[in-house]
Amino acid sequence: MLFNKSFKIIFCILFFYSTPVFSFDTNSEYAFLLDYKTDQILFEKNSNKKIFPASMSKLMTLYVLFDYLDKGVVNMTDEFIISENAWRKGGAISDSSTMFAEVSSYVSIENLIRGIVIQSGNDACIAVAEGISGSEDLFATEMNFFTQKLGMKDSNFKNSTGLHHNEHYTSAKDLVILAKAIIKDFPQYYHFFSEESFTWNGIFQPNRNNLLKENIGVDGLKTGKTDQSGFSMIVSSFVNQTRLIAIVGGLPSKEKRTSEMRKLINYGQKAFKRSLVFKANQVIDTVDVWGGEESFASLAISEDINLLLDIRGRRFLNARYLYNSPVTAPIKKGDTLGKIIILNDDQIIIESNLISNKDIDGGNFIEKAVDAMGYLFN
């Protein structure tokens, strides 16, 4: 039988801060702020709205490339050619973001990554697409394969660059999913995003993510801009052992983009405090055991649950836990017996397993017979 129980989590600790606490809003057309560790949504505005991602699309180009590197299909020292197509669409002649690679030159994958991350080079993106898949069209099918794999439900990619196409779109939430996947799946390559400049073909270019130079913990990821998308930006920050991922977009200028992102990151860092809600192995209830040496098993929290809590005064969350009863012995320590769900205003914040905190061996024939009779009559 499935049991479903609820209770309130009461916080008795009061948090005091010298800085004033504020509500938050943004002039950005869309925005999304996520706690990397728990997937808590700290702020959202039009997060599922269809948007044109511009150069933020290049995060998916990089994800595909990182996957090929991780699997050993290609290596950092491998070189891809800058075809005439890549040069005309994304090179110096194109009047678009470029790493200024020369036509028919060969560029190592390592330098192409820098050309994409730091210089937002369309020529570098097309060279990667052609080097991996033979053409941008075929590469786009690989990009869309990963949208499905990562759960990016509102995305469709038509090219590697983010140059405008009416059928090339995504959402703020999907791009945050992608950014988190890059950090989580390929930490060995994330350092590229924090490099502040790159020189290629004698031409120096600074990283377009100008928040890297500010003391707010930003260490990646990407900016974007087309006439149709406006100015956009997705970043990650790491301060006080807390990583946040944030996106803003649809803004009229680079300056507005930077200021709105700075406000959003500052809000995430100042308005929330990470608190221990449950300790690992904390027992919250018991469950009946059938056919065991003991009649009950403890339902214990499987891991420390730390959440970012709004310091503006909320003192409780709701928790719901589910389990089947009875459970059948033998039971091993660490076996999953149920799950706990923590909610804020009916929004699920986090789910975690409930486990047995000890071994329970199967009982003898008499103990099993007694249990069977008891459950038969109940």
Can you describe what each PLM-predicted range is?
Residues 152-156, 164-169, 173-378:
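Domain-terminus/edge residues, biased toward the C-terminal soluble/receptor-binding domains
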Residues 7-8, 28, 93, 136, ...:
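Hydrophobic alpha-helical segments and their boundary regions
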Residues 18-20:
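N-terminal signal peptide c-region/cleavage motif recognized by signal peptidases
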Residues 22-176, 180-184:
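Active-site-adjacent loops and short helices of periplasmic peptidoglycan-processing enzymes
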Residues 4-12:
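Sec-dependent signal peptide recognition
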